[in-house]
Amino acid sequence: KINLFFEKNNQIKNFLNFDENKNLMFFFENRLIKEHLSKLLKKTKIKVQKKTIRSIDLAENKVSTNLSSKSYDLVVLCLGSNSPIYRKVNGNREIKKNYKEHSITCSVKHQIKDIGAQQFFLKEGPLAILPYNKNKFSVVWSIEDRYFIKNTKNLSNYLKTKLSNLLKTNRISLGNIQSYPLKLSLKRNYYKKNTIILGDGLHVVHPLAG
């Protein structure tokens, strides 16, 4: 089941509740997915090289790295959301918007019994809890910049205090706390000749909170 908590009215509402004893969905840690994909790649003829891309030549389909330059039949760019290399493809034509918010993410170990997926609508912004297993869940909190800036230097304690108050327990342990600014970015052109942009380089949208 999924519960929604509204801080303004101090109300908890049940959003989804299935009684069939079947899994509604599954969540996987990104780290585990990468490890599994890495093992699968080692069993194939796909060659993975760790290099730093310096530039691309669209006319010759050539990619220049810190070690060499080589031409390819197809070039797929997945370089995150801010790489200047994308300008070669889309000419910096994109739709942008600054949400003036940050996303805070972390993993939490706990001893809470039967905790499910929950979303809390707080004054700072929506916070979502997504369980990995019975003793661990992930947190995604979309928080307004004014609250983020005020608590940047003490982010770990700020987040732990907020979670402890929401979950009515201090017996939680936070790990892998990360944060990044939220923005909208939609590329108008996503391919040119034999080069295509995919992933965050193509579009970045608001995560809401999970």
Residue positions per predicted region:
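A general structural signal for well-ordered alpha-helical segments in protein cores
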Residues: 2, 33-34, 38, 101, ...
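Conserved N-terminal helical subregion
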Residues: 3-88, 97-101
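A structural signal for short hydrophobic beta-strand segments in well-ordered beta-sheet cores
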Residues: 4, 56, 129-131, 190
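A short, flexible beta-alpha/helix-coil linker loop
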Residues: 19-22, 110-111, 144-147, 202-204
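Residue-level recognition of conserved beta-strand positions in structured domain cores
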Residues: 65-67, 74, 131, 141, ...
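Conserved FAD-binding catalytic core of PHBH/FMO-like flavoproteins
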Residues: 81-170, 175-177
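FAD/FMN-dependent oxidoreductases across multiple families
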Residues: 150-210
